[in-house]
Amino acid sequence: MLSGQSITLRPVHASDMEMLYDFHTDIQNRGEYFPRGILSEPAFQKQFQENGFWGKDDGMLLIINSANETLGHIEFFKTVNYLDEYELSYQVYSTEQRGKGIMTEAVNLMVQYLFETKRMNRIRLIIHPDNAASRRLAEKCGFQHEGTARGAWYNKGRHHDVEVYSILHDDVIPTS
């Protein structure tokens, strides 16, 4: 578990699966910029059975508050095999909890953890240009804007440009 001031990041437990699948399939509550694809329940369960949503180059942690309520999740994954980077994906499940700094704390905890435990030089965020909340989050967490990837993301029936942000290992854990 990774503990912050107001949240804890913890692995997914078997007892979380029903709730987690309900959030996974609630497309209307995902927010405007979260991918719309869903897995079947057997495929979702199989993925959990294989590795508990935690592997060498990918993983998911739940975001838990002090009342032990699940607020959302954060994931990391290897982008492509020839780049020395991970990408983060995240979601706050309840619209009432959005905009309260939960994800800023979660991203900071995850970035610190990944750079302390993985031999990876950079972590990136891919953000829709209209997603002002995620752009602010990236900047608050020290990510640098690198530019626009034109037509790189397909969602809701069309291709979208995305903004690329990154943070480097030495930005977080300077070498002496």
Question: Whereabouts are the PLM-identified features?
Answer:
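Acyl-donor (CoA/ACP) binding surface of acyl/acetyltransferases
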Residues: 1-27, 64-176
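Conserved GNAT-fold acetyl-CoA-binding loop/helix
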Residues: 28-49
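Sparse recognition of residues in long alpha-helices and their boundaries
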Residues: 36-37, 60, 154
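A short helix-loop-beta-strand connector motif used in the catalytic cores of GNAT acetyltransferases and
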Residues: 50-62, 72
